[in-house]
């Protein structure tokens, strides 16, 4: 509950202005709750309307994205770019292609990106963008045509000194490559810094793909060492998701001596008591772009279960949610606690609801 009157008033203004943006409300509330002690000490923040500026994007761009499928049928999706804050540098944040994408989700992601980017010590601001386009089940040619259409509008609003997008859910090196190619075509210039997450053959960075998953495990290892005088060694780990964050969290946790026994995608989850065979997961998800249920068909002794939320019923020592926002509700948190987990570390953006956090924070 917010106690500071200034924080409370700013939050109430957000609720009144955008009553349907639940994910954004949640992100702002959590941040304001953490900022209350500082706000109490700094009355000049209220005088200068700093929090009001902090929670309102500088600019929101919405546009249509027409594209043609392989059968010649025209489709129209909606594209977004939320340019949230450029106080210390160009907007910086990923692009998400997923059917659930809406303004509330992108505002929450862009808002959190301000804080994440400021912690790097680099002069970069925060933003986020994407579309309700679903790349799953689409051919390479269809994804390329969509990306080219998307960039045909987005290019007007970005630049290496203005706004630097990257990847997120549904946007990997393939999609970034298509987007970058169209940007170069439209601008008649090779501005490599306009997009991050590119392939290594055209300006990408080594370990960029692994960075989030590895970083999550390094942070978790430090938490275990500092707070529990313990480590990953010999621990059982459950990881939700099977994208870049989850895959490379699995890789690093295994290197640190843990046994990862479960992973998931949006349809369901796999359980392998002997430990996930990561080479098979990589082949299914990164090479074939398939579904995780294919793992159970290839690995004797493993099982696949429909419905991704059930993954948290599997007992573990360490839980690493790496899928999507609000994947852990109070019900899942209760299962994690019941299963005896000693640590929960978040790899996804805001994967736990406030009710879940109240159960996990003990």
What is each model feature region?
Residues 207-210, 214-310:
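Glycine-rich phosphate/diphosphate-binding loop of Rossmann-like nucleotide-binding domains
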């Amino acid at each position: 509950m917010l106690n500071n009157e200034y924080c409370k008033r700013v939050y109430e203004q957000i609720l009144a202005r955008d009553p349907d943006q639940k994910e954004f409300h949640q992100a702002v509330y959590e941040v304001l709750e953490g900022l209350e002690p500082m706000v109490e000490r700094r009355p000049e923040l209220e005088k200068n309307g700093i929090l009001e500026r902090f929670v309102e994007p500088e600019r929101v761009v919405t546009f249509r994205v027409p594209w043609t499928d392989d059968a010649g049928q025209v489709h129209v999706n909606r594209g977004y770019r939320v340019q949230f804050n450029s106080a210390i540098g160009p907007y910086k944040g990923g692009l998400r292609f997923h059917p659930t994408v809406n303004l509330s989700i992108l505002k929450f992601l862009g808002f959190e990106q301000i804080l994440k980017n400021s912690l790097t010590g680099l002069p970069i601001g925060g933003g986020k963008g994407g579309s309700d386009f679903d790349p799953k089940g689409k051919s390479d040619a269809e994804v390329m045509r969509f990306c080219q259409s998307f960039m045909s509008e987005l290019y007007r609003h970005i630049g290496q000194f203005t706004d630097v997008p990257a990847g997120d859910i549904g946007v990997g090196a393939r999609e970034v490559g298509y987007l970058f190619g169209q940007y170069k075509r439209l601008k008649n210039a090779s501005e490599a810094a306009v997009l991050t997450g590119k392939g290594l053959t055209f300006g990408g960075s080594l370990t960029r793909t692994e960075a989030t998953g590895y970083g999550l495990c390094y942070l978790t290892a430090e938490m275990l060492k500092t707070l529990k005088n313990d480590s990953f060694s010999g621990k059982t780990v459950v990881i939700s998701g099977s994208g870049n964050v989850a895959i490379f969290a699995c890789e690093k946790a295994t290197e640190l001596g843990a046994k990862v026994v479960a992973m998931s995608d949006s349809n369901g989850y796999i359980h392998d008591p002997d430990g996930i065979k990561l080479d098979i997961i990589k082949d299914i998800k990164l090479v074939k772009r398939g579904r995780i249920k294919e793992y159970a068909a290839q690995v004797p002794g493993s099982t696949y279960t429909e419905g991704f939320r059930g993954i948290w019923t599997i007992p573990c020592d360490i839980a690493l949610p790496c899928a999507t926002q609000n994947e852990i509700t109070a019900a899942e948190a209760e299962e994690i606690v019941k299963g005896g987990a000693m640590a929960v570390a978040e790899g996804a953006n805001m994967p736990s609801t406030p009710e879940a956090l109240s159960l996990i924070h003990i």
